[in-house]
Structure formats: structure tokens, C-alpha cells
Amino acid sequence: MSCKESPHVGVSTTTVSSVAVQAGDSKIVIAVVKCGKWVRLQLAEAQPNLLEIGSSQDETRKLLHDHELLLAKLKALEDRVWGLLQEADRTAEANKEQSEVYDAMAQTLGEAWATLVSMLERRRELLGLTSEFFQSALEFAIKIDQAEDFLQNPHEFESAEALQSLLLLHDRHAKELLERSLVLLNKSQQLTDFIEKFKCDGSPVNSELIQGAQSSCLKIDSLLELLQDRRRQLDKHLQQQRQELSQVLQLCLWDQQESQVSCWFQKTIRDLQEQSLGSSLSDNKELIRKHEDLTIKAKEWDLAMEKLKSQALGILLSKDLTEKEHLQLSNQKLNRLQEEFGRLMVDRKAWLTMAHDFFTSANEAFDVLGKVEDYLKLLKSEGLSLPALAAKHEELHREIKDSTAAALQKGRTLISQVDSCRAQVTGIHETMGRIQKRVDRLSQQCTAHQEFALKKQQLATSVDDYLRKVEMSVQEMRLVLATTLDVGSSPSESEKILNKYLELDIQAKETAHALEAAAKITTEKNELELNEVALLPFKVKRLEEELSTLSRSVSYRSQVLQTYIAFRKSSEEVEEQLQSLKEFYLTESPWEDEDDAVVTCQSNSAERKWQLFLKKSFLTQDLSLEFLNLISMAKENEILNVKKEMHIVENVMEKQTNGREELSRLRMAWHLKAMEGKPVKERWETFKEKLKKTTHNVKLLHEVLMPVSALDLGGNLQSMSDLRRRWIAMQPQLQQLHEDVQQIMKEWEVLSGQGVPLKEKAEQLKDLIHLHQRQRERIQEYEEILYKTVQFHQVKEELTHLIKPRELELLAQPMELEGSKEVLMQLGRSQGRRAHVDHLHRLALSLGVDIISSVQRPNCSNISAKSLQQQLEALELDSRDWSAKAKEYEQVLACSLEYCTTREEINELKESFKDIKKKFNNLKFNYSKKNEKSRNLKTLQYQIQQVETYADKIQALRKKMEKVNKKISDSVLSYPSNKANTLVEAMEDLKKHVDDFDKVVTDYKMNLDLTEHLQEVIEECNFWYEDASATVVRVGKYSMECQTREAVDILHRQFQKFVTPSVPQQEERIQEVVSLAQRLYGLEEGQKYAEKIVTRHKEILESITELCGSLVELKEKLMQGDVPKVNSNLEDFHGNSIDLLKEPGRDEQTTFSEERSEGQAQGADVSAINGTREDGLPVGLRQSFDKEDSAQGLTLPEDTLSGEDSECISSDDISLPPLPVTPESPLAPSDMEVEEPASSSALALHISGYRMRTGTGGLGKAPESVLPPPTAFTDGYHNKKDTFTSHFERPYPQFKAEPLLTSRGSGEMSTKLHVNVKCPARMPREVHDKALPPSSQAQEISLGTQEKVHADSNVTKTQDRLHAALDVSPGLSSQSDTSRSHQRQVGPQGDRKNSSAEKSVVSLAGQAPHFSRLLSNVTVTEGSPVTLEVEVTGFPEPTLTWFKKGQKLCADGHLQVLHKDTKHSVFIPKVCEADAGLYVAQAQNSSGTLSSKAILHVTGNHGPPITRINWIVLCIIYVSVSVIYWLLTQ
């Protein structure tokens, strides 16, 4: 501390004295400083610093206590200071001069003391504030500790209230912390401000004070910062825990609300599920009102639920929620409850509405049922009939059903919908039960219609049963009557037959009774049906008529048999009686000596027998007449041997008549002999008596024969039959009368010879004889007329039965029969019936004419035939009308028969069409099931042939349809319009289906043709790719050996000759492939289909372009002399080209893994023979290419040779494909001949060359396989067409089992060809001889090999695949090197042809003749059999002609020309030398002509032996080919 500044600043100060005050640890030193006239007090030292506040409250308190003591001690010095001031005042008063000084000293000293005291007071105040600050800090720290303890202690709460209390505690702690913190901050601010003010009020140069202030402020700030850090950290934890607790509280509150809402919804849902829909309409209305109230209330709860859901959504959006899953589940639960509640509310509303409709309908139903019940009571009292009552009951029952149907249906619908809540529909069930009970009760009262319907059903069932029995019986009778009646058998057999017919007659009567019962039942049924006409069904009438006809036939046959049997029995009895009487009259003579009684007895007995004989005889005669009459009425062929039977009966009757006359004579003689013994007078008297009696009887008979009224012959059959029976009964009497007259005449003659006077009785006798004669004539006439009249009426009655109106009605209404058999049967019956009617009509007409002519005789004046004549005329008219109608009916039946036949033909056509369509669909389906591997070209062509077969079947079906259409059009006028329309519509429908199917077949065939064409073009493209790839490889390979620019130039020109004409053609094929693929498969699929081949084409073109560039670069490099580098580049290019050549194998379909696995042994052997490596290249090719080329190379044209050729392999040695005829290729292919090498080494070279081709330019799938070519070269190349524009358009010959070479430019497909080439001048002679053996040797070995494999060379597919030939470039020599000895592979059928081979031009998509098997050269031994066979296909089917040496070949005794399907052959059982020569098979159709040729060589029995090595090679090839063929056909 210092005093105020003196005005004399520059005056020095001097410390006069110092005062030290100490209290405890506190100490101050006060110095008295004098400066001029000024005296001041200065705080020289203060311990601790005046602004030191301590580090804690205890320290502060101690400092405050010490400061209080220090201040108290300083206060104690105040009196001394004031005493000193008073002394100064006294001194000043004493020393007036120094008064100012003393005044000044007194003034400064007082101020200094006051300042010192004030400073110390302020320090005390500072320490007091510091103590308060530390107290607040302590309280703040204690609060912090309490809050931390609160946070650290676990808090358990069981309810939201406890959680809310806990949150309040959090809030309180937070609030208290904030309050304490604020208090502390205020205290710290107050203390800091006080220190700053204290520091500012002190001397500014007092560094200790400043340091003390800084130290104190630092302590304050440190403590404050420490506490605030704790508070902030604690506040953070408090906030975090409070947030968590708030979330928990929010969840708890949400759960509480959710539980509340869920409880309400669950309770309401249970109520909705359990509440009934009401038991009455009023109850239902009340429930509907409550439901509407519940709907209003539910809206409030829906709002609460939506609020909960929004809260849940907000909670779920928070990042630090730990119970999201629980909340989500609860939220989902709320959603489910809300959905279920909404569904139940909607269902409840709908169910209540439905229940309301149900109860409304139920009330209406109850009203209707009440009315029905009243009406039923009224009907019971009326007593209606069953039909009327049934109609009423049915109407009431319908009304009951209709009135209750709606209610019951609504109830059932409601119950089915509320089936899961049975309690809700209890009232519905009860109401429905009441309705049903009442309906059942009323239905039990309304049973008349059911009884009526049951009765009708029973009647219908009975009718059906009766009709079924009738039909069965009619069928049995029809079968029996279909046989011819044989009446000429023995009586026992006849009786058996009669018994059968009698049983059949009984059956017919029973059937008639059944039919009558059915008719009665039907009539009764019709009577019950008030709205229907009471008519018999047509079926019943038809059966009744047919049964009547059959019954008449049965009765007729029974009658015939009965009459015949009775006649036979009666004739036998008559014969016995005749013999007995004859024996009596011959043996028994009346003796005179016998008693009269005995004679009389014998006479009476004989007379009785005689009378019985007469009766039996005339009865037999009547039976015979009746039998003859019945036979005459029989149908044609109904009775077996009719004429014979009639003749037999007539003979029997004639015999009986003769016997009766003879017996009459014997009887008369016996009587005369008996009278001889009597006296004359007695005899005379007896004579007179007998004459009188006989005369009387004759007169009586005359009166009988002359009735008063004329006899009308036009009566009915019954009257005529009665009259005839009476007449037959009179015949014995008439015969007896005749016998009496004859006896009188005999006795007259006897008596006249004995002298008896007879004159008186002569006149009488004469009159008697005359009258009797007249009577005899009349009796005969009467008997004849009566017999014919009865017969006439019998025939008339039979005709009446046949042509009665009912029969005509049936004829006018022909039945609708189902089939032609029924119509034909009906037509036969009608024709038979008409023939029978015509026969009876002719018989009746004949009888009527005879009767009328007989009546016109004088003796028949008392017989009238007018009525009979009228009946005859009416019968003739009726018969004519009936016959006309019968003919019309037969015409109708004939039309029906034709209609049925046509309909059946149409049905057969439909069945044929269905069968064709089914088989065609199966064909398509089976083809579609085949995988891509199986759908090769051969399968496709076979499919096309099958489709063509079905197309031919369709054409044949069309021809049949045309015939049926013509038949319909010819007879359409005879059909009814509806039937004709039916047939026409059926044919039109069939024609429509056939046309549609024909279009399908045509489209399918067109699709197959396009597919075939597409495959062929693709195979041609692949073939070109293989050639191009192989050529690129060879050119690249040869270019590496070129050392001069001229050699490379020659090689380049040769390569350009190959590329230039073929690439545009290949691009045309590519375009055709794309076009065909798009046409077949659509735009996108077609592009995908052609993508591979287009990509491969691009790769080939790139390789060609790269090769050309490499050759150009090579020429440039050769000019610069940089050969090794160029060769290295070409080696790389050569490797890439080989890879490109192998690449197409991955696109092929068929693999030969089986061939490789099955044929490893054979492949190893052939590989050893061929000397090839595993990669397919010859071993020597890589080691000594120059050496092989020098031995096997081709000679360049002279204009291309130069002196530098020795430095490079000839460019022509690349074996390029044949080029078009150019100046550089002077020889045409047809002018070239190839001699085939015969050695095994040449064959090995062929095979190794083939392996090199397949290994470097093939598929790359079977490098170790020797014989089978890659699938791309085989399976795809069969059935090629004939026209090709370049080498790449024509297929290459095949390498068959025999090592033959086929010319590719000759005019025919021949397997024996030769090539004349020049040996290069630089080629060694021995090498040339090895490469080109003599022609004769090659021919012999070639033909010998052919002979051994001839049987198989044209059979197996694999052998055809192995067929290869030497491909020679124009102007180049033959080469057997592997790079040139084998040319391109062809299809599996061995049928490759070039453009000039057959002189035919057809398109690739055509169907010109095509050889699937060619002729091959063959050499046979004389006397051996031989077969030349080809297989040709095409459409139309080609005609094949055989030629030998230009002459047409025909079959004779020496040879046979055979043809089966597509195979044609010439077979010579024994070959002779004359058979040798050129054989040509020429196939021709409208699409083209094709020929195949072969040479037959005939050798003697001393032919050249086959060397062992050739035989081994042949066996190896044959075994290999057989194994591969077997594998391919599995």
C-alpha cells in the first residue's frame, strides 16, 4: 500500500519506520515512508497475499480467522495512530512554520491508515466471499454426488406412476443442479469481480497483488470448471437416463392406452362374435340400432387407435429405442384387432341386414303358410278326384316351397356365412326350424300329387316292364318264325313241332295279354294326365301290330300242323276201318242155315261200321281240303316242299276215295249175296219198301236242296263255315242215300232176272234215278261252290287283317330307325307282307271268279253271288290302294336305307379322318420329343416322307368324300329336307375339318422342307468353313518354308484363286441361312439361330484377311531380308489358324465319345498303321515335311515355275480346292483319271490324311478316333441336291471301306476313275513309282478290295461316312500326302454328287430323284451270284431304268430286276463273262433325272491272290466300321 502521489514527483522517498502485525499464519508489514513533506503508510509485506483466497473452504476459513485476528491487532494500533496524529497536530500548532508540513503529514497518514484499514476490510470481505463461494461449491459438489448416487443406484418401478415419480426426481435433481450451478456461478462471478476490483483499486504496480489475483482467479476457475465438468457429465447422463425413462414412460403410457384400446376392441370383438342376430324381426331391429350406436362409438376408438398408431410410428422412428420389436408386435396386434374389428363390424352389419331380410321373409312365409293351411282344410271338405286334388296339392306344395324357399335359402346362406359363430344364429336356427316344421306338417297334408306321381311312375314302370317282356317275346317268336315250316315229317315229329308252336301260341296270347295290360295301363296313365291326349304310344301300336302279325303266323302254322296231323291220323283210321270192312265183306258171307237174328246182328254191326267209315272218310276229306286251303294261303317259302305236300295229300284222298268206292261195291255185293237166300216174294216186298223209303228220302233231299230264298254267298266267314259244317255233316247221309239208290238199282237188276213183275215200279224207279242224278250233280256243284266260298272268305278275312286301316296308318308313319340294318329288316318285312298280300289277292280273285262263274250255271239258280261280287270288287280296290301305299312305304324305307347307308359312310369317313389326324399328331409329337442330336437330316427326310404319306391319305379321303357328295347330290331330292340338310351339313363340317387339317399338314411339310433346306445350307457353310480353315492352315504352314518373294507371291496368288470365287458364294449362303431361320423361327429367334454361323463366318474372313496381310508382310520382309522374324510371326498365325480350325467342333451336335471308348483297340491298330500322332497329324509331317513333300508333292504348271522354286515348297502343294477352269488349269476334271494306289502304305496314307483333316480342321472332339469322321462332316451332309455353282457348293466324295477314288468332275457317279499326271522332273523315279503305281496293278487290287467289301459298302451308314477320295486341283499332279490324299467328307449316305454328275438341275429345296445308296464297282468270279442295288427316293416317286452298255436291261431267265419300296436291284444268280460291263441305274421323275453307274468285272477262277497285308487292312477296316456302325445305331 502507498500514499497518494505527491505533487513533487521527482522527490525521493525515505522509509521512516515499519510496523509488523502477525496473527497465526497471516502477517503484514507496514512501512512509514516520507517523501518530501508527505508521509505515507505503505504495505510493505503481506503473508498470505491480500488476494490469496485459499484452496478450500477450511483453508479460507483459517485465512479469514487469521485475518480477523490480524485486523483486530491492527485495530488495536489505531489509537496509537490517532494519538500520533494528535501529537502531530500539537506539534503543528507548536510549530506554526511547519504546520503545513505537519498538516500534510497528518492528512496523508490518516488517509493511508484509512486505506490500509479499508484494504484489510476488503480482504476480510474477500475471504468472506471466498468462504461463501467454497460453501456453494461444496453444496454443488454434494448435489452432484447425490445426483451421481441417484444415477448409479438401480431404480425399480412397477407402474407408470412410479416411473413418473422417478422422472420427477430426475427433474428435481436436474433443477437443483442447475440452481446450485447458478449459485456457484454467481458466487464465482461475484468473487472474481471483487478480486478484479480489489486488484484494480490497489497499486497498479504491485505485482504481488496481481499475482495473488491471478492465483485466486485460477483457483476459482479450476474449481468451477471441475464442478461444471462433473455437472455437465452428470447432466448428460441424467438427460440420457431421463430420455430412456421418458421413452419407457412413453411406452408404458402407450402400452396402457394400447391395453385399454385393445381390451375395448377385444371385448367388443367377443361381443360381436357372441351376440345373437336376433330371434325375431323386432329383436333384430333393436340389434341393428345398437350396432349403429356401436359404429358411432367405434369411430372414437378408431381415432384413439389411429393416435396410438401415429405415436407408435413416431416412437419407432426414434434411433435409440431398444424395444422396437415389442412395439412393432403391439402395433401389428392393434392393426390385426382393427382389421378384425372392421371385418366383424362389416360382417355384423351384413349379417344383421341378412337376418332382417330373413325375418321379413319368414314373416311373409308364415302368412302364406297360414293361408295354405286354411285352404287345405277347405279342400278336405270338397272331396275332389285324385287328379284334381293332386293338381291342387301340387300347386299348394309349390306355393309352400316358393313362399318358404326365399326365407330358408336366406337362412341357410346366413348360417353358412356365420357357421363359425353358432351362438349368433341360434334365433335363425329356431326360426328356420319353426318354418321347416310347419312346412313338413303342411307337406304331409299335401301328398295327393306325390301319390299321383307315384302312381304314374308305377304305371310307367309297369308299361316299360310289359313292353320289355313283349319285345323279348316278339324277338323269340320272330326267330322261330324265321325258319321254314316242315310238315312232311313223321307224325311224332310233327306233334313235337306242333307242341312248340302251341307253346309259342300260348306265349303269344300271354304276350298279347301283357300288351293289352300295357295298353290299359297306358290308357289309365293318359286318363290321369289331364293335359295330354289319351292315345297309345306309337311303340305300343307297333308292337301290337307286329305281335298280331306274329300271332297270326303262329296260329296259322299251328292250324296247318293241327290240320295236317288230324288229317294223317284220320286217314290212318279211315284206312284201318276200310281194311276192316273190306275184310268183313270179303270173308264174312251170310249163310242160309244161320239164324236170322245172327245175320241181322252182323248186318247191323257192319252198317254201323259203314256209317262210321263214311263219317270218318268225309271228315278226312274235309281235313285234306282245309289243309290244302291253308297251304294255298301260305307265304312264299313259308312251308317246306309245298307242292310235294299237296301232292301227297291229294294222293291220299284219291286213294281213300277209290277205297271207299271199292268198299261200297263190296258192301253192295255182300247185301245182294245176303238176299239171295231169301224168297223172291220177300225180296220183292223188301225192294218195294226200300224203293218207297228211298224215293221219299230223295224227295226230301230235293226239297232241302231247293230252299225258298236264294242262298247269299256274300255273308261272313262264320255263316259260310257253319253252312259248310252242316253240309259236311250231311255228306254221310247223302252218301248213304246214294248207296241206297245204287243198291235198289242192283236189286232191280237181280229181281228182273228172276221174273219178278217190275213194270209197276219201273216208272217210279226211273224217276228216282233221274231225280237222284240231278241231285248228285247239284250236290257236287254246291259242294264246290261252298268250298270255294269258304276259302274265299278265309282269304278275304286274312287280307282284311293285312290291309286294315290300322295297318295303313302304321305304313303311313314309318318309324325312325337308327341304323341301316333295322331299315333293311323293316324293308324286307314290308316287301314280304306286300308279296303275301298280292298272293292272297290273286287267290281271292281267282276264287271269286270261279264262284261267280259257277253260280251262273242252271243248277245254281237259287244261289246269289252279287254281294260276293261287290265284296270282291271292294277287296280288289282296297288291295290296290294298300299295295300303292305299301310301295310308297317301301320307297320311303328305301330312301331311309340309302340315308342310313350314306350317314354310316360319312361316319366311317369321320372315323378315318380322326384316325389319320390322331396318327399325324402322334407323328408330330414323337418328332418334337426328339432332341437336337436325333433330328439329323436323315430323320428329317424320313419325317417328310411320313408327312407326304399322310398327305396322300388325305387326298384319298377327299376322293371318297367326293363320291359321297356325288351320291348325296344325286339322291338329295329323294330325302326329306331335314335329312338332306343333315347330310350336307355333316359333309360340309367334315370338309371344313379336312381342309383345316390339310392346311396344317401342308404348312408342317413346308416347314419341314424349309428346315431341310436350312440344314443343307448350314452343312454346306460348315463344309466351306472346314475347307477354308484347313486351307488357311496349309497356306500359313507352307508360307513358313518360303525363302523368296517370288515363292510367297505364287502362294499368295494361289490362295487368292481359292478365296475370290468362294467367299461371295458363302456370303450368299449365309444370307440364305439368315432368311430361312427368320422365316422358320421369327426375326429374333432366327437371328439367334444364325448367330453362330455368322460369327464363324466372320472369324474365317478375319483369318483369311490376316493370312493375306501376313503374306504381304512376308513379301515385304523378304525384300528386306528379315526372314526369321517373319517366320516367327507366321508360326504364331499358323497356331491361331489351327485353333480356329478346331474351334467349330464346339458347335456340332453329335459326339463320338462312345466310338472312342468302344473302339480304342481298333483305333490303336490303325494309328500304328497310319503312323499318326495323337493330334491327328502324321508323325513324319512335323519331322520331315520337305522329304514327304518331295515324295508326294504336285507339279506346278510350267508357267509358274522359276529358278527359285527349290527354296520353297510349291505353292500348289497346299492342296487348295479345285478352282474354276482357268488358263492355269488346262485340264478339266472330267479329263482326269486317278489310278488308285493298292499298297497298304497308300491306304495308310489315306487314313492318316483323313486323321490330319479331322485333327486340324474338324471338330476337335475325337482326335484319337481313326475311322469315324466328325459329325459336322457326316450327319449333316446326306440328301444333298444336285446343282452346285462352285467347289464349296458341291459335296466331296467319301472314303469308303475299299480304297477307291471318285472323280468329282466326271459325268456320272462312278467309283472307278483315273488321273493321268506327270511326274516332276526332279522327283526320284522310285518315289514316283511308289506314289503312282501302274494302272493295271491298281485296278486289280482296287477291284479285289471292292469285291470283298461289296456287301457292306452300300449298307452301313458308317461305311458311307468313311468314303473319301483324292481331290486334285486342275493342272496338278496326284498326291498321296495326308494334306492332299483325302478331300472333303460328305454325308452319311454316301450320295454326294457334283454339278455335272447326273446332268440334272434341281433346286436345293426340290424333291428330285436322290440316291441314298449308290452303285459301286464290283469284281466277281465267274459262276458266282452278284447283286447291283440302289436306293432312290423323290417325289413324285421316281421311275428307275437299268441300262447295260447303253441298252435297256430287262428281266429274263438269266437275271432278275427287282423292286421293293425304294430299293431297286439287279440279281444275277450265275455270272458269266458276257455280264461284264458298265451298268447304269437311271432314276427320273418330273423334278429331275439322276443316274448312278458301276462296272462289273468278271474274272476266272484263277484270279490273283490277295496279299496278307491287304487282307489284314481290310479286316481292320471292316471290324472298325462294324463297331462304329453298331455304336451309332444304339
Swiss-Prot record:
Residue ranges annotated for the Ig-like domain, each copy included: 1409-1497
Modified residues (Phosphothreonine): T91
InterPro entries, per database record: Ig-like_dom, Ig-like_dom_sf, Ig-like_fold, Ig_I-set, Ig_sub, Ig_sub2, IgLON_domain, Spectrin/alpha-actinin
Region (Disordered) location: 1153-1240, 1259-1285, 1324-1356, 1369-1403
Processing after translation: Ubiquitinated and degradated by the CDC20-APC/C pathway. During brain development, CDC20-APC/C complex degrades CCDC141 after centrosome translocation into the dilated area. CCDC141 is restabilized in the dilation until the centrosome enters the dilation, at which point it is once again immediately destabilized by CDC20-APC/C complex. The oscillatory regulation of CCDC141 protein is needed for proper cortical migration.
Biased composition (Polar residues): 1334-1345
PROSITE patterns linked to this entry: IG_LIKE
Coiled coil spans: 220-251, 758-785, 865-967
Keyword Nucleotide-binding set for record: no
Pfam families hit by this protein: I-set (PF07679), Spectrin (PF00435)
Keywords tagged on the record: Coiled coil, Cytoplasm, Cytoskeleton, Immunoglobulin domain, Phosphoprotein, Ubl conjugation
Annotated GO CC locations: centrosome; cytoplasm
Protein name: Coiled-coil domain-containing protein 141
Source species of the chain: Rattus norvegicus (Rat)
